[in-house]
Amino acid sequence: MVLSAADKTNVKAAWSKVGGNAGEFGAEALERMFLGFPTTKTYFPHFDLSHGSAQVKAHGKKVGDALTLAVGHLDDLPGALSNLSDLHAHKLRVDPVNFKLLSHCLLSTLAVHLPNDFTPAVHASLDKFLSTVSTVLTSKYR
């Protein structure tokens, strides 16, 4: 999926509002995913998955940092996310559907925290962005 110039502008503007909260939003999205889609917990058997756990917060920061990296490289997502794609495909072997589930939870989290900025156009752009990130992360599964 190709991001238009308007999509890129919307994604950058929305992510600038996230600011230093990317890790917190990432952790909240993970908690939403674990609650809404309990089968996703199987990838984290060694984690304390309780609300506010240090392990979920740490992984949320990794998610937030990866998305911040992606926002900074909208014109070369495959290059920017290559190592992360390798990790998830070859070492962690995460089922690709889980990226879609996390994307859904990220959109929900952003909508809750950025209600005035989460317009239909921004929602659509963020959805396209997260879909593109998911596609890149699963590209090495083949």
UniProtKB/Swiss-Prot annotation:
| UniProt cross-references to Pfam families, sorted A to Z | Globin
User: What GO CC annotations are associated with the protein?
Assistant: blood microparticle; haptoglobin-hemoglobin complex; hemoglobin complex
Protein origin, superkingdom: Eukaryota
Q: Which residues bind heme b?
A: 88
- Please give the residue positions where the record annotates the modification N6-succinyllysine: 8, 12, 17, 41
Which residues are recorded as binding O2?
A: 59
- List residues of the Globin domain: 2-142
Q: Which GO terms fall under biological process for this protein?
A: hydrogen peroxide catabolic process
Q: What does this protein do?
A: Involved in oxygen transport from the lung to the various peripheral tissues.
Q: How does it assemble?
A: Heterotetramer of two alpha chains and two beta chains.
**Annotated protein name in UniProt:** Hemoglobin subunit alpha
The gene behind this protein is HBA1
